[in-house]
Amino acid sequence: MAKITRALISVSDKTGIVELSKALAGYGVEILSTGGTAKLLRESGLTVKDVSEFTGFPEMLDGRVKTLHPKVHGGLLGIRANAEHQAKMKEHGIEPIDMVVVNLYPFEATVAKPDCTLEDAIENIDIGGPTMLRSAAKNNHDVTVLVDAADYAAVLEEMAANGGAVSAKTNFRLAVKVYQHTAAYDGAISNWLGARLGENTDEYPETFTIQVKKAQDLRYGENPHQSAAFYVERGITEPCVSNAVQLQGKELSFNNIIDLDAAIETVKEFTDKPAAVIIKHTNPCGVALGDSPISAYLKARECDPVSAFGGIVGFNRIVDAAAARELTSTFLEAVIAPGYDEEALAIFTAKKNVRVMQVPLLAGHLQTGYDLKRVVGGLLLQGRDLGMVAATDCKVMSERQPTAQELAALDFAWRVCKHVKSNAIVFTNADQTVGIGAGQMSRVDSSKIAVQKALLPIKGTVLASDAFFPFRDGVDAAAEAGVTAIIQPGGSVRDEEVIQAANEHGMAMVFTNMRHFRH
């Protein structure tokens, strides 16, 4: 290991850079820098040599050319143990650079702004930064490269232990991180620009890059014979399972993560009142609204208490002690919510295996992004199903108008139905599911299962269907069970027949003109 004697520092994110530079100066490291970074370091009392002085060539083209010079890249790429390299460097007056500290122009943050123009995006594509990073990473045996402020402290600790040097093992790890970082950076640029090919700026790009980082290894996958790991996307701010914090409990399983995702996404549908959902195998087995988390949970569990055993529970409100006591009175795999009060957390400790997950507060976050479905050899890419039509905005197709109470129930049922596997049929009142039929190959069978599962009275409830009724038999079955109103997308060639069935039974029927298939 050779002692670091010269470092080139040029960063957009200046977190921790002054402290790092002062520590390097303490080891006698010469600091090269550019632009705003050099200005900041000088203002902090450090001696800095401009890169233009080091290369003998000025910055030009509005700062587009600063470090793209043989004296920079020769100093990074020259192999210290290669005599020919060293001779050529000496011949051309190239001095070695032992450390590079660089992070890149904030392209992703720039294009995330609603008023970002193509020119704005182009000007935030870093050229010199990735080039230096890649040069340093290629010659990682001789050069330490830092692209993440989170690594500054560890490198300084190693330098302290090794007389100002960094090990080859650490340099290799940091180099790998560089290539992961530049791949993600280029992928973001490619995705954003690629979506703007042609006249339609909303086209999907010809090539699509997704960069994810491993959050944790999992014991196994969906089944014990499958290996698995959990990866998360970069820069996620929306409250979701991927940025949830585990406060206690056993290690998350593959199936836990999928069900936690289903739970938190379901309760996001409800903002006006406390909501609770109980999930089994990604399907809701009970959803309810209440005046408090505990009242919502008790009503959700009432729908199907047998299936609720061993389930995963999601809330849209902070969980209090009363809810925690009830949750710990039975066996549950996990709970996910936007927070817990101190007493609730203390109660959960009595059930140390229960996984308690916290997401950021649900209000005020924009829901965006793609939905990816894996097929063998490929990916299907689509926008997430974030659409929702309120029952009051639906078109009434029946002779009878729905009552205000029915409209409230239809709205609740439609929001729940969106999160049930197709074919999906849901019976509800205004704030509680009564029967849920999920995942059947025929819609009428889903209706029959919803009736069979119902422990609460179906008479006077409403029905939601995630897609149109292909025949009137589903409506007839619902009427026989006591349903008074139906919400569905419409769009069948037999819509008139289905509407006529509703009229014959005196039911109200509204069309959403929006389908919510879920596979």
Swiss-Prot record:
Residues 1-147 form the MGS-like domain. InterPro entries: AICAR_Tfase_dup_dom_sf, Cytidine_deaminase-like, MGS-like_dom, MGS-like_dom_sf, PurH-like. It comes from the Bacteria. It catalyses: (6R)-10-formyltetrahydrofolate + 5-amino-1-(5-phospho-beta-D-ribosyl)imidazole-4-carboxamide = 5-formamido-1-(5-phospho-D-ribosyl)imidazole-4-carboxamide + (6S)-5,6,7,8-tetrahydrofolate; IMP + H2O = 5-formamido-1-(5-phospho-D-ribosyl)imidazole-4-carboxamide. The keyword Transferase applies. GO terms for molecular function: IMP cyclohydrolase activity; phosphoribosylaminoimidazolecarboxamide formyltransferase activity. Pathway: Purine metabolism; IMP biosynthesis via de novo pathway; 5-formamido-1-(5-phospho-D-ribosyl)imidazole-4-carboxamide from 5-amino-1-(5-phospho-D-ribosyl)imidazole-4-carboxamide (10-formyl THF route): step 1/1; Purine metabolism; IMP biosynthesis via de novo pathway; IMP from 5-formamido-1-(5-phospho-D-ribosyl)imidazole-4-carboxamide: step 1/1. One of its GO terms (cellular component) is cytosol. Coiled coil: none annotated. Pfam families: AICARFT_IMPCHas, MGS. Keywords: Hydrolase, Multifunctional enzyme, Purine biosynthesis, Transferase. GO terms for biological process: 'de novo' IMP biosynthetic process. The keyword Ribonucleoprotein does not apply. Its EC number is 2.1.2.3, 3.5.4.10. NCBIfam families: PRK00881.1 (NF002049), purH (TIGR00355). The IMP cyclohydrolase activity resides in the N-terminal region. Belongs to the PurH family. This is Bifunctional purine biosynthesis protein PurH. It comes from Trichlorobacter lovleyi (strain ATCC BAA-1151 / DSM 17278 / SZ).
